[in-house]
Regions:
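TPR/TPR-like alpha-solenoid helical repeat scaffolds
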Residues: 56, 93, 157-160, 184-193
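Alpha-helical adaptor scaffolds
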Residues: 81, 89, 93, 105, ...
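Short inter-helical turns and helix N-cap capping residues of alpha-solenoid HEAT/ARM repeat scaffolds
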Residues: 16-17, 48-49, 79-80, 111-112, ...
Length: 239
């Protein structure tokens, strides 16, 4: 009895040999079959090898978006973190605007950092024209979150929105957390100068925030632009 193509693919993707799984994913993308979509999405949730996962996503982009986008959208609500993160990653690669429906506040605030970061990236790629400010506002709720890599991911996402992100970033200038304020200032700097380095931008932003003290030294949280050379070195309250 002949084995169905989707069953053969599932068996190959279940091999203990990563090279076999990689070849199976490559073949599934080279010779698309509608029956492969569920198999590919299911495998994304458990695949341990980065290169195989990347090939699985590529294979999904080779299939009709009418099939992949609805299936991936459902997968973004899976109980398995890897399933959610890979679904967002795949949606961003498919690039179909219908995938925007999966980018919710709960996804952007996902407790799993890999899921959150994937949803941030998907959000800036899939956001409909005219709703860039909306996604910027959602992303700004994550300012100050996580370690350097997480903050860099958010910075890249917001910087990609360009001027659309500026109102949300400026609103964060009066946030009670110094870390949030510094992160926002650093991203504004990156938007103004895309060639700047994140580490330098965040260092300078922290310097400004620290100098302002708690609470901010200016009513609206705007950085004090007075050059150090022009500052009065005497302590406040002295003549």
């Amino acid at each position: 009895m002949n084995t169905r193509p989707d069953e053969a693919l599932r068996a190959a993707l279940g091999s203990a040999d990563a090279s076999v799984r990689l070849q199976a994913a490559l073949s599934a993308g080279t010779y698309p079959n509608d029956a492969y979509v569920d198999v590919l999405v299911d495998r994304c949730a458990v695949e341990a090898d980065f290169f195989v996962r990347d090939m699985l996503t590529w294979a999904l982009t080779r299939h009709p978006a009418d099939l992949t986008v609805p299936r991936l959208t459902v997968e973004t609500t899976s109980a398995v973190p890897q399933a959610r993160s890979q679904a967002f990653h795949s949606l961003s690669k498919v690039g179909d605007p219908r995938g925007w429906a999966a980018v919710t506040e709960s996804a952007i605030q996902d407790a799993d950092e890999s899921v959150a970061r994937a949803s941030w990236r998907a959000g800036v790629i899939l956001v409909p024209v005219g709703q860039e400010g909306e996604v910027a506002t959602m992303l700004s709720t994550q300012l100050g979150r996580g370690d350097r890599d997480v903050q860099l991911s958010l910075a890249r996402a917001l910087a990609e929105l360009g001027d659309h992100a500026v109102p949300a970033l400026r609103a964060a200038r009066i946030h009670p957390s110094a870390g949030v304020r510094a992160h926002a200032l650093a991203i504004e700097r990156l938007i103004e100068d895309p060639d700047d380095y994140f580490d330098e931008a965040i260092f300078e932003a922290m310097r400004i925030v620290t100098r302002q003290g708690e609470p901010d030294g200016t009513p609206d949280g705007t950085p004090d632009s007075t050059p150090d050379s022009q500052r009065d070195p005497r302590p406040e309250g002295t003549e």
